UniProtKB/Swiss-Prot annotation:
UniProt KW keywords: ATP-binding, DNA damage, DNA repair, DNA-binding, Nucleotide-binding
One GO location term (cellular component): cytosol
Gene name linked to the record: mutS
Lineage of source species: Bacteria, Bacillati, Bacillota, Bacilli, Lactobacillales
Protein name: DNA mismatch repair protein MutS
Pfam annotation, one family: MutS_V
HAMAP family from the UniProt entry: MutS (MF_00096)
Amino acid sequence: MPRKATTPMMEQYYQIKDQYPDAFLFYRVGDFYELYEDDAIKGSQILELTLTHRSNKSENPIPMAGVPHMAVDSYVNTLVEKGYKVAICEQLEDPKKAKGMVKRGIIQLVTPGTKMAQGPDDSQESNYLTSVVEKAGGYGLAYSDLSTGEIFVTHVKHYAEVVNELLSLRTREVVFAGNLSASDRDRLQKANITVSEPAELEGEHAEISYVQQKLTDSMEKAAVRQLVVYLLATQKRSLAHLQVAESFEIGQYLQMANTVQRNLELTQSATTGRKQGSLFWVLDKTTTAMGGRLLKQWLSRPLLSLDRIKQRQQMVQALLDDYFTRENIVDSLKGVYDLERLSGRVAFGNVNPRELLQLAKSLEATKLIIQTLVESGNPDLEKYGQGIDPQSELAESITNCLVDQPPISAKDGGIIRAGVSEDLDKYREAMNGGKKWLAQMEMEERQRTGIDNLKIGYNRVFGYFIQVSKGNVAKVPQDRYTRKQTLTNAERYITPELKEHENLILEAESRSTDLEYELFSQLREAVKAHIPDLQELGRQLAALDVFVAFAQDAEEKNYCRPSFSSKNEIAVKNGRHPVVEAVLPAGSYIPNDLVMDEDTSIYLITGPNMSGKSTYMRQLALIAIMAQIGSFVPADSAKLPVFDQIFTRIGAADDLYSGKSTFMVEMSEANEALQHASSRSLVLFDEIGRGTATYDGMALAGAIIKYLHDKVGAKTLFATHYHELTELDETLLHLKNIHVGATEENGKLIFLHKILPGPADQSYGIHVAKLAGLPRAVLREASSMLKRLEAEGAREINPSRQQLDLFSPVEVVEENPLKAEQEELLDEISQVNLNEKTPLEVMQLVADWQQALKEE
């Protein structure tokens, strides 16, 4: 938009806007933040603001919109959630004291990855900013949640691993030093990831050396430096809460591609994108926001270290065995606020009095938690409690300084306790004395004038005034009262005596308010020195919260403590799918065993659609993940290997981010397993080959099975509708056939949902089609067509291993096909609800049907 003729203020605006062309500029004017030009037009649409104009009388009025400064966070968050950046331009001096144009400057650039303000729905969500640097030998990747100050860093060899990490983390913004192709940029944007250029800062900054202190890898150092520089450049303040970067190897954890996590629905439903329907939804019995976020982190990075897994199990077992200790901890955790994010707000300088008091209350609750743990009588719980520092002195200093129920704002007074400051107490005494004097004056003036409804009031424009109703104006003493304001029903006056005391009262109020803010700022700075200790405490309480949640899950859902095998064997007794079990009526889920000894690497699973093959496969993966995060698992007993990787090909959804077809995605995911799986991996393949022609698909599926068997040796569950593949057990020694049972009763298909040995020996595809509601005419035509095709292309196969056709004609062949009219009549009969008919109506219907058949 071309620039209009400007005033000095607008000239200042344009100079600042030129520095942030890709951001919305929120420009502070008095009590509002204003947007101009294109920002105003676009912002008014997104934020549903009224679009008006500045300089309406000029030939070229400037589009303008505004938001109140008290509500700015919500508007900024709305823009940031949609992927935009927002530059906050503040008045840097008191407009009343400014000489000429008020100085303004950018105090913060809010971006999708640097959002500090979190709504109630975001409490369990981490908001990651990720930094990626490319060097010879690979990529350094560092990510941080600014609201908590945590920083993690790793390095990978291949760009595909970078993209997988970005998608798995669900990072909101990536700072990328390098050339990003248009297709890659588009893919990230489709995943709601904002791509930003690195920032630059002159000189050295203490935060950089502090967070890098444990790093030795140059690539990781570069990634962390780029991350911290971007944070400092955008936030424009000291970031004392940034934590020492924690370096990790991807191989330290069970590796799962983003697609695997999505297929298994670890943290969100694949259907809705929401928490409900995910494994996180089932397991999340956490009490604190910190615990919820940590549980999510654990789900995305299950452990490989058996020692660490067992340490977690020990804590869960101890809490499971002691109901009263567990319940006391839960009660105390309810009094713990989000220490991690409160610490971030302290460092940021925007913590308010209520939040500081929340911090103190959290520390008081921590003392109760420590007492409960130490007195539990369990060595593991006692040791955990002894390792927690309750920060008692800090809690005491906060509660001794702040009133019990402070206001949110620190600038309006009423936040500091009496006795904290002698000067403050004197100002308050003067204020109270002045207010008593005002009350006394009001009473005396009523007596002097005879005006019973005379009252003394105050506003910021006129200060203190005497208000008299219109009906009593004649009684006003004109020699002492000076009219100041006329209202519809009243007149307002001042007197020399009133103005004299007003100055004394307002001066005391002003000094009191200023001193309270000064004392609060001193308290905030004192708390800032404790940030590292508060962050450590937050981590300890978050982990305890997750342990308690796991113990509650185990008790309420009858989960068992899994054991681990070094012999690469699986023995799950009566295993259940945790999410499916949670949504079904209590006791209705049908459990299944899964036993694979050392000599068995592949189970080939056959059975009709909808019978539960996919559920059975996912069930094993979820049990393995739960076991490796330290949780108990849904089974009567479970012995598992420690898996190093999980690969899946489950579901028929296209890759929304890459634009690949279903078959290409299928082959890509299969290739991931073939290239990278080891004998310690878990592979789940569901209906590989269905995305292409039948014989192509069957050949590919068979070759993939043979490769997994001969070259990889991973524990594999392979579901297929190609029944010919079941003959592979004759040549592949480590492959066994299993199937999902089903039976037919009175012409109806009954899914048994039980896993049985051997291949399925009968097709129920036509029954499934019936369950789906396909018209009889379609089913009949499909059966006839399939019968002809089989007759034309029949080939000899083992009679005991007949082709398991999806639409088998055996069950539906009709010697005398029905006429169309008869078919319609049968459909009408099948749809009648006899329970809603009277006997007479039923008799009439039967008579009508008989007549119709006679006519045909």
